[in-house]
Amino acid sequence: MAKFLRLHIRGIRSVGDEDHDVHKIDFLSPCTLISGPNGTGKTTTIEALNFVTTGQMPTQKKQNFIHSTDVARKTRVDASVTLEFIDVKGRECTAVRRLVVTSGTKAAALAEEHTLAIKYPDGTVNTLSSKVCDFNTALLKHLGVPRAVFKYVIFCHQEDSTWPLSEPKELKKRFDDIFQLTKFVKAQERMKKIVLDFKKEMQTHEMSKQLYETHVRDKLVARQNQEECERKISKRKEETDELKERKANGQKKIEEMRTSIHELEDTLTSFKKTELERQNLKKQLSLIRVEPYFGTEEELKREIEEFRGSEGRSYGEERARIQKKIGKNNQERQELSQKKTEFENRISSLKAEVIHCQSLKYDLERLENQLRSELDLEHDADIDIEIDNAITLKIRGMSDKARMIAKNCAELQSNLRTAQEAATKIEVEMKTLQNEKVKLEKEVEQLKFKIKQGQNATAGMKDLLKKEEALRKSLADLPLLDENALTECKLKREKYLKQLDILKKKCAEAEKNAEKDREKESLKQTLSIARKKMTAYQRIYDNNWQGLIGQAPDFPWTPILSKTFHKLRNDKKIMEEDLRDVQLNVQKLETMQHQYRKQEESLTAQELKLSENIFEACSCEAEEVSEKLENLRKRLKKARKDLAPLSAKSNLYDSYIEESKSSGCCPLCDRDFKTKKEINEFSKKLENMTLSFPTEQEELEKLVSKLEKEEIIIVKAEGQANELQRIVKELKEVREKNRKLSTEMAEEKSNLSKNEKQLETVNAKLKLAEDLQTDVGVIQQLYEQTEENEKRYEQLVSESDSSDGLSYTELRKKVEDKDEEYRKIVQEGEELQKCSEERNKLQSKLNELGTHRVSLGEAAAQAGAFAEQLETKIKEIQECITAISQKRNEDLPDAQFKKDDLTRNVSSKEEEKKKAEMEVQMMKKELDQKIFHRKSLFKKVQEGGLCERQLMDKENNIATLNASLEENQQRQKRFEEDLRSFDSSHQRESILKDQLTRMIIENKIKELKRTLATFDGQINEDRITEQKQAYNKLQNELRLIGNEEVKIYTQMQEYEKQKKIAEAKLSTKECQNAESNYRDAIIELAITKESISDLTKYRNCLDASLIQFHSEKMGRVNGIIDDLWRKVYNSTDITTIRIRSDATSETSSKKVAYEYNVMMVHETGTEVEMRGRCSAGQKMLASLLIRIALAEVFGGSCSMIALDEPTTNLDESKVEGMAIVLADIIAERRGFDENGKLRGRDMQMVVITHDERLVNRITISCRPEYIYCLGKDEHGISFLSKRYPDGTVKRVNTKRRF
């Protein structure tokens, strides 16, 4: 319990700031008396106590509260108030509040640092400073009393000592502060505002929920479109890969067939050429007449060389020409060798890359085998197809295992909670038993005390009997009282009081009617303003409603607007879906049109290019190429036919000339020439015939070569002409498709424009609705308030119609007149009452002694019963000790062991669960890494395949180079042989030449025969025809595959666009956060609803709790007041007093409020308001008792009250009565009875007065150790002295010296 020890005042009001001027007050128990004349600083003590405990000063200006600098003759005065007390926890505390005032140019009064020192039982001291904490809150916490109780109850100022009987408004304010209802009312107002804000937020959350729900649906649609497009693209890619594979196989087959056809055609051509050459050689051989050379060809060539060597100079030129050819051939061989070296270097690097590719293939195969092994796939399973499903199954299996472990862990946790609850239950039971034991021990102590009281009661009854006898003698000595006059006065007073109450009730009703009239006028103005606002809103948003539903509806607008919003959103959703479909169709058609346009441009460019190539090659149109080729082949055939016999004729005529010269006869008819002249003529004739052969043969060879080149060009042009015909046909088809596509796209664009216009209309309506939405909540609230105000106005009108009678002013005048008459009657009753006070006082004491004697007798009689109860309680304590021991030694260890075992199992299972979850995460991460590694390896292997193809090409190139080098070497040998041939002699040139020609022709014929023999079984023209037909068929198939590839490519482009649109939609912030926003909106909506519900429940609960709290506290206060009044009030006119609190519902805020009145109860049981109907003594007594009761109930652990001038405005007789009342109160609230026995908590009272009679009376009753006396010296400084019972006076500090 908090207790005040001492108070030190320095530099406050008239208290000086020097050490010897400090007022040091030690608070005595039960009463501390402070006496002194008026103006010596008695009230300063109350102000200092109020200031140190609550921080409140009696004036707003600190300069007026602090000691004057002029009186102190200083420029600076330091003021402080120090309070030493024991706090609610029994700790000794010292609170110091400091102030300072300065004078001069910068005069100011400031509050300095306040400190609170707390001394703990172990001797340590902790100091709190106002710089680091809320000093007022900390101090009130240690005292355990609210601020309002200190201000209005404990340390009430002299001017406010009778506030319990003040005006109702002021009384209500102070009682609300004491009950601390203001903060609860504010809390209710805040909760009401929060509920309204939550309702508005709930509407916002509902709209947000609908919006986010639309986003979620859009996201789902976009994701479905994306997945569908990806699936279609994947399918088209597979089809494309299949087509590419078919195309590659077809191209490979075409290449093989082309090679085969060319080989067959080359073989057939070679066969025909070889056969034609053999026929020509046979004809040439038949024309040669020389005898065969009997020897080898080398011998014959040797002789020819020797013959040429005899010619000398002409063969030297031929030799130089051959050497020049040899040099050129050597240069060509060096270039070929250099190219070969480069190719070999490149092949080496490519082989290294191929080897690296093989290692990558091995790594890829090993990685795929690992994946198959880890994912339990078959050895021949297609990993690209089955890996995703296998990974899903693998992860799902591990996740199921982890979930199973988590489930087991949850079960163990549930068992652990059960075990914990069991252990907690045992501990609670032990605590309950322990509390029961403590309670029983307290009851045992009380029973022992009662037994001891019963034993002491017998001795106390003898003293009480002697006191009763003395009181009866005193009562018999008093004069008799005229009871009839007193009764008549009381009856007359009650009659006037009833009439006054009736008039007051009528006056109150009239006042209420006047208030209702004022409220009615206010409501009328409010309704007028509200209707104008609603009309203005209707006029503002008339165009919006016209655009939405055609006309403005009646109020309320919220349901109609919500329905319209819902309909517009649904329409917008449907139109957006239709618009999206049309846009997709338009994009698809535009893509196809773009592809057709590109295809048309490509075909047109090919057509122009082929036409130009054909014209450049043939100088004719494509249709004339076949005819021109046919004519050219006829000419070529004729030229080849004319060229064949010329070579044979030349050789034959040369042999005839040689034979005629050597044999001297005609080689045809063997006729001998007679003279040499005939031989020469014959030879000359043959030479003339052979002179024209070389020129003609050369011309024919040139012609044949030219025609063959033209044939090659025209054959190529014929293929181009066929390709041109195909392109022209395909171009017509493309243009026809493009035309149909343009028509379809025009229709779709028309639909698109129509849908966009409809969507714009819906968006415009939505904008109108959103504009309405901004103020519809305000309009709805205004509408609801208007309806409530109209109902209230109608109610007030009906009530005002039924009310009649006098006005409030007339009734008030009657009340004042009747009150004046009542006061006169009360004054007469007080004069009579004064006579009966002494008798009532003696009778009251006599009754108290009788009651005390009866209680002592009952205590003595009940001592035996208390002894039996004591034995029962001791047995119950022993049973509690046994039960506590059993639970502590048996039940609690078992429960703790079970809980610890389950805790260990839960910990291990938690570790196992975390390990399983970590394994799932690691497996997912490892599989993702392996899949990524496999993709990179697969890509590198594909790149390695390109290196293999390049290696094959380079190897083919180097083979070609080797063949060219071999040919170069053969040519070199031939040139060298030719060169050597020029070193031979030139004898017998003609014969040897003919013989050499013959030998060559015969060798050629033999070689041609062998060549023709190799063609047996290889010449098959039907096979060539069949292969050409198959070749054309494959080309058609490849063309169809190409068209299919273009079609698939167009579709893939369209799907890619749709996919990009879906991805763009999904990449937006709305779609990315759609689920979380929707979930948050639902959560916010649910939380808001629950918050509204909880706040409503809490408000209702708080209302009920406040009502219950108020009723309980007020009941306790009235009980204490009734008890004190009956004990200290000596008259019989007022049986008791009480505080009446009437609950009133305030219409504006719909909250419960209280109106307070102090009522006095007469002997008849009638309750009358005490304010204005009681005497000054009754008023002071009632105020004092009310403050004591409030201090008892709301003072908590601080049983303290200070009375400043309690005898103010009291006459001499009333002062004596007040002294008796205070003495009785002090006696009633003593902590110990007359025998020194503990009775309850001790009460501290501080009485500050200038009335010596009151001081003497209280001194006789309480017998304090000393009395504090205040005075002032010649300098106006207040000083404090102690006056002891023997009359000696001692100054608290030494006297001031100058």
From Swiss-Prot:
Keywords: ATP-binding, Cell cycle, Chromosome, Coiled coil, DNA damage, DNA repair, Hydrolase, Magnesium, Meiosis, Metal-binding, Nucleotide-binding, Nucleus, Zinc. Its cofactor is Zn(2+). It comes from the Eukaryota. It is found in: Nucleus; Chromosome. Residues 222-291, 317-598, 622-660, 691-719, 754-1092 form a coiled coil. Residues 622-719 form the Zinc-hook domain. The gene is rad-50. One of its GO terms (biological process) is double-strand break repair. It comes from Caenorhabditis elegans. GO terms for cellular component: condensed nuclear chromosome; Mre11 complex. One of its GO terms (molecular function) is double-stranded telomeric DNA binding. The zinc-hook, which separates the large intramolecular coiled coil regions, contains 2 Cys residues that coordinate one molecule of zinc with the help of the 2 Cys residues of the zinc-hook of another RAD50 molecule, thereby forming a V-shaped homodimer. The two heads of the homodimer, which constitute the ATP-binding domain, interact with the MRE11 homodimer. Belongs to the SMC family. RAD50 subfamily. Component of the MRN complex composed of two heterodimers rad-50 and mre-11 associated with a single nbs-1. Its EC number is 3.6.-.-. Zn(2+) binds at C666, C669. Component of the MRN complex, which plays a central role in double-strand break (DSB) repair, DNA recombination, maintenance of telomere integrity and meiosis. The MRN complex is involved in the repair of DNA double-strand breaks (DSBs) via homologous recombination (HR), an error-free mechanism which primarily occurs during S and G2 phases. The complex (1) mediates the end resection of damaged DNA, which generates proper single-stranded DNA, a key initial steps in HR, and is (2) required for the recruitment of other repair factors and efficient activation of ATM and ATR upon DNA damage. NCBIfam families: rad50 (TIGR00606). Mg(2+) binds at T43, Q158. ATP binds at R13, N38, G39, G41, K42, T43, T44, I66, Q158. This is DNA repair protein rad-50. It catalyses: ATP + H2O = ADP + phosphate + H(+). Pfam families: AAA_23 (PF13476), Rad50_zn_hook (PF04423), SbcC_Walker_B (PF13558). Binds 1 zinc ion per homodimer.
